[in-house]
Curated annotation (Swiss-Prot):
GO terms for cellular component: centriolar satellite; cilium; cytoplasm. Microtubule inner protein (MIP) part of the dynein-decorated doublet microtubules (DMTs) in cilia axoneme, which is required for motile cilia beating. Regulates motility patterns of both 9+0 and 9+2 motile cilia through differential localization and recruitment of axonemal dynein components. Required for motile cilium formation and movement. Involved in the establishment of left-right symmetry during embryogenesis. It comes from the Eukaryota. The gene is cfap53.L. Belongs to the CFAP53 family. Residues 417-443, 455-475 are annotated as: Disordered. This is Cilia- and flagella-associated protein 53.
Length: 516
């Protein structure tokens, strides 16, 4: 029992020297500061504010990006609409101007036609005069044609009959052909040189453009990588902070649950201790009652034994004195003893009765005292139970509030996590769309370059084919010309209709080409 008393849990209540006096031991000062809960709450609120600020900033940036994208699209759409509207207005204006010009021209033509119709109303004399004028002009024209024909025939006859003129014309024509051929070769070389220079310039420009675009793409890629790394670091930091917050909330929740279990266990131990104390008190009272009863029975037995010893001594003493007087005395003594025994029996009975009454009174007093003490203990127990219940209820309410607050914080953290994940997914989707657009633009640019190169190659091939055709046509023309020249030189006459107009002028004036 001493070990159980020594190892039982200690409480803050200590009984005093007087009945119903209880003292409360002071609590040990907490190692935490007084405003620990306030500081902890502030720290939680600051962390939550930081997460909310980050989420709000991310949402704001996403809204800004979306607004900028929509604004750019609207600006582009409005610009295209304005350009289309301006083009349509210009087209309508040009169309109206053209209609006005055509209507004005139509009016002028109608007026001219009317005037012409009015002017055509002529008399017979005017018609005869016009007919005479027409006959005269026709006669002059026919005479001019006849004179031209005669001059041509004379010139033709001169060319056919002059051998020196024929050889000189052949030499001049040959010189012109050589000069034109040399000019064609020089022009071809110049065109080839210009084309090569243009190809070189185009290659340099294309290479510079390619390098500039590669450098720009590299800068964009580095910028995207840095931005993605920064976003990944921010997401990782937010995720780590959220994990730490969740871990701290879970630890706090487990601590609160453990504290609640500890309070329940303390309440159960207190109830068990009260039951044990009640049992010990009842046992102590029963032991005290049994001890008093045993003392009383032992005292009665000792008194009876003393009385029997005294009577036995008188009897033994009577056997030693055998005189009559003594016998008589013995008889008297026996009577006295009998009376005394009866008196003692009466007194003993009276004492027993008084003791029974006293026991009853004591038991009644004990019962009354026990009832009073039980009532007092019950009241104290009820007061302690109420106090403990209030403390437990308050602590339970505090724990429940903390659990609800932790659950709310966990819900907010989960919501923030969902927002962060949605923002991350949206950023990834935007990055994917942007990469796809850039890839599409790059592919389109590559296709344009390939088509441009193919077009340039086809153009060059067409130019080479055209040059080849021109060269072949030149050779054919030269060959035909030589054949024609030989044919003309072999014939006595060459007509003017097969000579170039520029050469015809030179041939028509012999003073320009005849030697002086």
């Amino acid at each position: 029992m001493l070990y159980s008393q020594r190892s039982r849990p200690r409480h803050r209540e200590v009984t005093g020297p007087q009945p119903h006096s209880v003292a409360v031991v002071a609590k040990f000062p907490s190692s935490r500061p007084r405003d620990f809960a306030i500081l902890e709450r502030r720290r939680h609120e600051e962390a939550r504010e930081q997460i909310l600020t980050f989420t709000k900033l991310n949402t704001t940036e996403r809204v800004k990006n979306k607004w900028a994208r929509v604004t750019d699209q609207k600006l582009l759409h409005n610009m295209v609409q304005r350009e289309v509207y301006r083009t349509m207005e210009e087209y309508k204006m040009h169309l109206n101007e053209r209609r006005e010009r055509l209507s004005t021209l139509l009016e002028r033509e109608e007026m001219a036609y009317i005037k012409e119709m009015e002017a055509m109303e002529e008399t017979t004399l005017e018609r005869q005069a016009k007919m005479r004028e027409r006959v005269k002009s026709l006669r002059e024209k026919r005479e001019k044609e006849r004179m031209d024909f005669i001059a041509e025939k004379r010139d033709q006859q001169f060319r056919e009959q002059c051998e020196e003129l024929r050889s000189l014309r052949s030499q001049i024509h040959l010189n012109e052909v050589c000069t034109e051929r040399m000019a064609q070769i020089v022009l071809k070389e110049e065109l080839n040189r210009q084309r090569k220079e243009e190809d070189t310039i185009f290659d340099q420009l294309w290479e510079q453009d390619r390098l500039a675009k590669e450098e720009q793409e590299e800068k964009k890629r580095q910028k995207r990588i840095e931005l993605n790394q920064e976003i990944a670091c921010l997401q990782k930091a937010a995720s780590e902070a959220q994990k730490m917050q969740e871990k701290r909330l879970k630890e706090e929740e487990s601590k609160l649950m453990a504290e609640e279990q500890r309070l329940i266990k303390l309440e159960e131990e207190r109830n068990l201790k009260e039951k044990q104390q009640n049992k010990l008190q009842v046992k102590s009272m029963l032991e005290d009652s049994i001890r008093l009863k045993m003392k009383r029975l032992a005292r009665e037995q000792q008194e009876e034994l003393a009385l029997d010893m005294k009577i036995l001594e008188h009897v033994m003493q009577g056997y030693q004195d055998d005189t009559e007087e003594k016998r008589q005395r013995k008889m008297e003594l026996r009577k006295e003893q009998q009376l005394y025994r009866e008196y003692l029996a009466q007194q003993l009975e009276e004492e027993k009765r008084q003791e029974r009454e006293m026991d009853k009174m004591i038991e009644a007093e004990l019962e009354k005292s026990w009832a009073k003490k039980s009532e007092q203990m019950r009241k104290e127990k009820e007061a302690r139970k109420r106090l403990m219940k209030d403390v437990m209820d308050t602590r339970r309410v505090q724990i429940q509030e903390k659990l609800e607050r932790n659950a709310k914080l966990q819900e907010e953290l989960a919501h923030d996590k969902e927002l962060l994940e949605s923002a991350t997914e949206e950023h990834k989707q935007l990055e994917t769309d942007r990469n796809a657009r850039q890839m599409k633009v790059a592919q389109q640019y590559q296709r344009d370059l390939v088509s441009q190169v193919a077009y340039q190659q086809s153009q060059r091939q067409a130019e080479r084919e055209e040059e080849q055709r021109e060269f072949e046509a030149g050779l054919t023309a030269e060959k035909a010309y030589q054949n024609k020249l030989r044919e003309i030189l072999s014939r006595p006459y060459v007509g003017h209709e097969n000579i170039h107009p520029l050469r015809r002028g030179r041939i028509s004036s012999p003073k320009d080409w005849l030697p002086q």
